[in-house]
From Swiss-Prot:
Reactions accelerated catalytically: 1D-myo-inositol 1,3,4-trisphosphate + ATP = 1D-myo-inositol 1,3,4,5-tetrakisphosphate + ADP + H(+); 1D-myo-inositol 1,3,4-trisphosphate + ATP = 1D-myo-inositol 1,3,4,6-tetrakisphosphate + ADP + H(+); 1D-myo-inositol 3,4,5,6-tetrakisphosphate + ATP = 1D-myo-inositol 1,3,4,5,6-pentakisphosphate + ADP + H(+); 1D-myo-inositol 3,4,6-trisphosphate + ATP = 1D-myo-inositol 1,3,4,6-tetrakisphosphate + ADP + H(+)
Organism listed in the record: Glycine max (Soybean)
Subunit structure: Monomer.
Gene Ontology process terms (BP): inositol trisphosphate metabolic process; response to abscisic acid; response to salt stress; response to water deprivation
Pfam families: Ins134_P3_kin, Ins134_P3_kin_N
Cofactor note: Binds 2 magnesium ions per subunit.
InterPro entries with a match to the protein in the record: ATP-grasp (IPR011761), Inositol_tetrakis-P_1-kinase (IPR008656), InsP(3)kin_ATP-grasp (IPR040464), ITPK1_N (IPR041429)
Residues at which Mg(2+) 2 binds: 285, 287
Keywords attached to this entry: ATP-binding, Kinase, Magnesium, Metal-binding, Nucleotide-binding, Stress response, Transferase
Conditions for induction: Induced by drought (early dehydration responsive) and salinity stress. Triggered by abscisic acid (ABA).
Binding residues for 1D-myo-inositol 6-phosphate: 20, 62, 154, 159, 191, 193, 268, 287, 291, 294
Name of this chain's protein: Inositol-tetrakisphosphate 1-kinase 2
Family, as annotated: Belongs to the ITPK1 family.
Length: 315
């Protein structure tokens, strides 16, 4: 394709998102920036046939109903040149907190001054009768632990995380959970945003460190939203602004490795640095189609990604 053809080419990118996601992601600044760079972002009505709303060079989406998946499959079979970001069956892997981290354990890359892994964790289907001490002997998993609903599908309950300090707190839980070891990490989480080949890492405030003295008096469990009431968040000491960023080589390799292993383009990775071993990094969560608008200059970040996709398909 000649440069003159590329210069005159416009691309239609359809988006199918829930109302809140439209408000946060499809901001006027993104629409304008994309439009200035030959991309027209078009809202898709998921209740109407896609055939009547096209043509599309690319479709981005974050809807999980079976009806939507069927619509997408039917449209894709008739329009194989339309790029679907991303295939629903691959996105589904991130809806389970065990399968989402499986990909990390199979990554094949070596870093000179750092290691990457996942925290120890176990699935608990019946929290009321679970005995963590057995797993303490076998796997070294001990209190405190972070309890996360097994389902990470974006539903109301999937974000209800809590810190569990003992058996009493564990038995008070109800839904199937993943218990993940709590690792002191200086109160900072590194969020690696991925959009295809585009990668951006930012640091954010996280749960603070918990001292051995504090552990002696903590009982039961506490939702993340109330952890600050314990004074725990200030135990770690290091402020977010003072935290050193992970090596760029780690950020780039982790993004590339997960993009290939998951087969996905739009996701972010939550990474912490072990407070006891500063070269040990742990992936604690992977989210599909995260809040990109929180990134500085997210408009060119997303627009450049979309251009990468549509131009590679039409080249």
């Amino acid at each position: 394709m000649s440069e003159s053809e590329v210069a005159g080419q416009r691309y239609r990118v359809g988006y199918a998102l829930q109302g809140k996601k439209v408000e946060s992601f499809i901001q006027p600044s993104l629409l304008d920036h994309a439009k200035q760079h030959s991309i027209d972002l078009v809202q898709i009505d998921p209740t109407a046939p896609l055939q009547q709303q096209g043509p599309f060079h690319c479709i981005i989406h974050k809807l999980h109903t079976q009806h939507w998946k069927n619509l997408l499959q039917q449209f894709s079979s008739k329009h194989p040149n339309t790029v679907i970001i991303d295939p629903p069956e691959l996105v589904d892997r991130l809806h389970n907190r065990v399968s989402m981290l499986d990909a990390v354990t199979h990554l094949q890359f070596s870093l000179e001054n750092a290691t990457i892994g996942v925290p120890k964790q176990v699935v608990v289907n019946e929290p009321k009768s679970f005995d963590l001490h057995k797993f303490e002997e076998e796997q070294g998993l001990r209190f405190p632990v972070i309890a996360k609903p097994l389902a990470a599908d974006g539903g109301a309950g999937s974000h209800e995380l809590c810190l569990v300090f003992d058996e009493e707190g564990l038995h008070a839980l109800s839904v199937p959970m993943v218990l993940q070891e709590f690792v002191n990490h200086g109160g900072v989480v590194f969020k690696i945003y991925v959009a295809g080949q585009r990668v951006n890492c930012v640091k954010r405030k996280s749960l603070g460190d918990i001292t051995e003295e504090k552990l002696k008096v903590l009982r039961g469990s506490l939702p993340f939203s109330r952890v600050s009431s314990l004074g725990v968040e200030d135990e770690g000491g290091g402020a977010v602004e003072d935290a050193e960023m992970p090596p760029q080589s780690l950020v780039g390799e982790l993004a590339r490795g997960l993009r290939e292993a998951l087969g996905l383009n739009l996701f972010n990775v939550d990474v912490i640095r072990d407070g006891k071993e500063p070269t040990r990094y742990l992936v604690i969560d992977i989210n599909y189609f995260p809040g990109y608008a929180k990134l500085p200059s997210y408009e060119p970040f997303i627009t450049d990604f979309l251009l990468d996709i549509v131009r590679s398909k039409t080249a």
